[in-house]
Amino acid sequence: MVLVLAEIITVGDELLTGNTVDSNSAYIAQRLTEKGFWVRRITTVGDDVKEIENAVREAISRKPEVLIISGGLGPTHDDVTMLGVANAIGRKLKLCEDCLERIKEFYEELHRKGLIDDPTLNEARKKMAYLPEGSEPLNNTEGAAPGAYVEYEGVKIFILPGMPREMKAMLESEVLPRLGERKFVQKKFLAEITDESKLAPILEDTIERFKVKIHSSPKGFGKYIGIIIFAEDDEVIGKVIRYIEGKGIKFREGW
């Protein structure tokens, strides 16, 4: 099975201190997997330009097809993700006029609704309209800060907000449609066996024989072992199941 690789970087001091649980990376990984991408690595860094720059450079050096970065796009002093990415790919930040107008309209709408006192487009708010040179803005339907999409050395880089509602909306509307069709399928099964150590050699043999990926974990208080099979198509998964059943293991689909 040929794997199309993806990586995820989440940004935020609050993630490193444990004050906020990183649900974004789990959601992004799940959606990428459903689209047929193999998430090889998830990295978390703080709100530091150099740390972000280094993490992005290292990810690019591993040549994933897709790199998704989430967090650090807001108006505060420690929202520096765009600058970190720009530095990593050797670009300058450039004002996106369309983004600036969108941000202006966003704050004016909040003011009309009585949610903020001042709609002025101050420097902190203007900062969100600066994107890495050569990037394409990604529309934020749930907040002020635009995302960005840029290709560099064959890697598709998507920069998304850290607020989960904003990130999810942008991922669904702006990112996933650009990624095309799935590259593999996955199916979940319950194996009627209580001892992982007895199942392990069977799975190792199966992985080598069929060139698939298999993840296993105990389920149902030891009554079952849950397995997820990743393969090129349903036909291969069917062959895998029949092969393992030939070793005396019974299955039922789903968890």
Curated annotation (Swiss-Prot):
Q: Which InterPro entries match?
A: CinA (IPR050101), CinA_Arc (IPR023055), MoaB/Mog-like_dom_sf (IPR036425), MoaB/Mog_dom (IPR001453)
Annotated SMART domains:
MoCF_biosynth (SM00852)
Query: Which Gene3D superfamilies does the annotation name?
Result: MoaB/Mog-like domain
Which Pfam families has this protein been placed in?
MoCF_biosynth
Q: Which family does it belong to?
A: Belongs to the CinA family.
Source taxon at top rank: Archaea
PANTHER family named among the record's database cross-references: NICOTINAMIDE-NUCLEOTIDE AMIDOHYDROLASE PNCC (PTHR13939), NMN AMIDOHYDROLASE-LIKE PROTEIN YFAY (PTHR13939:SF0)
Q: What is this protein called?
A: Protein PH0439
What are the disulphide bonds in this sequence? none
